[in-house]
Regions:
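N-terminal alpha-helical transmembrane segments of multi-pass membrane transport
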Residues: 13-17, 21, 27-35, 39
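Conserved ATP-binding subdomain of kinase catalytic cores across diverse folds
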Residues: 29-32, 38-134
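Polar low-complexity intrinsically disordered regions
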Residues: 1, 19-21, 46
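Hydrophobic alpha-helical segments, principally membrane-spanning helices and signal/leader peptides
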Residues: 5, 21-22, 61-62
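Charged, compositionally biased N-terminal leader segments and the immediate start
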Residues: 1-14
Length: 134
């Protein structure tokens, strides 16, 4: 699929304690619900020659762009007044998409399955809350 991805992944330069290389868990018969065409234009991506079935495979993580090295990230922060070790428990980063070789945009699949940072969940995400994020 040629849509204009230009991936880099500077996160791979971090010590291995900060990242886990992991592939998204496949989804059975994915469907495309919405495509943000304005964002695609801003990112210089062209989806016009790809049908919705192939886009669903791409955005579900069933098919990955060839120049990606997918990772989950470890991080920490304060949650409810306490320092907490956190991480991408249900998200996989494809990489940093470069626009005009100057701007970097993290491309991440949320709800793409368990990672070693998942606590007790299955790593999936319910559609409603994900749509509120856009």
């Amino acid at each position: 699929m040629t849509i204009g991805w230009h991936f880099d992944n500077t996160y791979l330069e971090l010590p291995k304690t900060f990242i886990e290389e992991i592939k998204p868990t496949p989804v059975h018969d994915p469907n495309l619900v919405i495509l943000n065409k304005e964002l695609a234009r801003d990112l210089k991506l062209d989806f016009s020659n790809i049908d919705n079935k192939d886009l669903a495979k791409l955005f579900s993580g069933n098919v990955l762009p060839s120049d990606t090295c997918t990772i989950a990230q470890a991080y920490a922060g304060h949650q409810f007044g306490h320092f907490t070790m956190l991480g991408d428990g249900r998200a996989v980063l494809l990489g940093e998409h470069l626009v005009n070789n100057t701007k970097r945009f993290d491309i991440q699949f949320k709800g793409s399955g368990r990672t070693s940072f998942s606590r007790s969940g299955d790593g999936r995400a319910v559609l409603g809350p994900m749509l509120r994020n856009i």
